[in-house]
Amino acid sequence: MSATMKQVVLAAYAKGNPKPADFRIEEVPVPQLGEREILLKTLWLAVDPLIRFSLDEKLLSGATRMERGAVMVGPTVCEVAASNHPDYASGDIVEGRSGWQEYAVLAPDQSDYRGPPRKVDASLAPVSTALGALGGPGQTAYEGIVNVGKVKAGETVVISAAAGAVGSMAGQIVKVLGGRAVGIAGGAAKCAALLDLGFDAVADYKAPDFAEQLKTALPEGAEVYLDNVGGDVTLAVLPHLKRGARMPMCGFIAYYGVGMEGPGPDHLPGFYRQIMAKALKIEGFAGIFAGKKGLEDIAGWMKEGKIRFAESVVDGLDAAPQAFSSVFSGHDHVGKLLVRVAPEA
């Protein structure tokens, strides 16, 4: 093992969508292992859009700001390279939040609310799925469709950002439950990928006839709208929701880079009118509430061939800043966007 390693640090707070220049790659010594600590070698890292909340100089309420020069945070899958902790052995594969770096030392006994690094069962699926289908995105999709959306057989569910990690899983879960899945994505390639995953219909929000595509895809409206984006896409969907429709809200990526006020005119009065007129049931949620049952159900569906995991992979830690920036700029990736930092043994 080399005596030094690479890590990606925050060079500047983001203004609008993050740019590669907001980050800096540094070479530092590999950290030394202390008592009851584990040394992790990063295999995979996820460039999650939620990280964006921590990159503003002026924060949204509830977010924790990163300091300039700090190692970028984010979920990872790692191999235990060395261990001074009885619960972990060299060679174990774990999922945690060790950040954008080639190696990290963690003290499992001093973990935050997420708990210590979770061991990954490589017999269930490729270990990278611990960051996607069998990780946070899978839990979020499950929570939104099963527990919050309460989707029933025969219902139509429309999903924004459907080609993303959460959306692509959510549509497949809808199909497992006997529902009709309608996906909204940007570009013909993404829409074709959704149909290949089993979605019943798609609408391309980048197309000039998006409104007509949406009308065609939802001839009788929808009982559930899983909203991942907010913004103009959600404004276009609202007229198609049936009275009493459920609207699980798990993201608003259209606004992640604009601060508290948001851009342009205030659409809230019109939004309120739609809520009142249609008696919409809106609920924000977090995927962590899906818990163990959600992951067990998803693993079972994957084993039965009812759900496929979609991943897009870029190689090398150096690629992480560009990969993260692409999440906010209409990238062509489908499913979970991952950075392969090192090959698996």
Q: Where on the chain are the PLM-derived regions?
A:
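C-terminal hydrophobic helical "lid"/dimerization subdomain
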Residues: S2-A3, F289-A345
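Glycine-rich beta-strand-centered segment in the early N-terminal region that forms part
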Residues: P29-V47, D56-W100
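NAD(P)H dinucleotide-binding glycine-rich loop of Rossmann-like/cofactor-binding domains
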Residues: M72-E79, P86-A161
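Short glycine-centered segments of the SAM/dcSAM-binding site in methyltransferase folds
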Residues: I93, T156, R180, A245-R246, ...
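Short, glycine/polar-rich helix-capping loops at beta-to-alpha or helix-loop-helix junctions
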Residues: E102, G186-L195, H267-Y272
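Mid-domain Rossmann-like dinucleotide-binding core that forms the NAD(H)/NADP(H) cofactor-binding site
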Residues: L131-P208
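Short amphipathic alpha-helix with an adjacent loop that forms part of the alpha/beta core around
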Residues: D209-E220
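Glycine-rich phosphate-binding loop and adjacent beta-alpha segment
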Residues: D232-I307, V341-A345
